[in-house]
Amino acid sequence: MPFIDSFCGKICDECEEKNNKQCGGCMASNGSSSLEACEIAECAKAKGKRFCGECEHIPCDIITRYAYDQERGDNGARIIRCKEQKARLVQEARVGVNPVSFCGHHCDFCFYAEWCGGCRSSYNCCSFATLFDGSTCPNVRCANGKNLKGCYECADLYDCDKGYYGRVNEYIAKATALFIKKHGEDCYTMTLKRAIEAGEDYPKTFDASGSVASALAILEGYIQP
């Protein structure tokens, strides 16, 4: 799939404006074509998104209005195209990448997996990371600084409150890191998969347990010899 050549997902080569040589394309002109200013282009640029598919709010009111406009709309085709392109970017970024994140979260089972390639990938869109400078999670920065594969290799893990480990009422990240430290990554992946198949809601069930120790105990309850 070629990369989308417009912010909204419309195919430029099929656009009547480009065919009439009135427009060079919104991406080619950075949203400043010879036509009227485009609010979609301005919105995407303001949010630092290459196209609407990278925005967590798709389909928003703006793109929906354009997609279903009676004169220039395409009955929502551009929205579907944006989502397909986003999915392709995530899929390509995750090829050959370890799905176990630095903090212990598992990207294969993360609710954000359809939007993010993972913190080890070249397409890291982690919503937590965006809260920090350079969109780099403190756990990732610290582990890389110590040349560690992940927080689970750190001697300071038990008392650490950096990044995810300092979030109130969220225990799953440290619990899974402790699990990996004790049992290894392969056991973690198989055990978490088993827990989810048994009906555990990852990460909600574990966070609702009330503590790191309780979350860890739930996960360890699914270990098989």
Feature roles, as predicted:
Residues 1-225:
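Cysteine-centered metal-binding/redox modules
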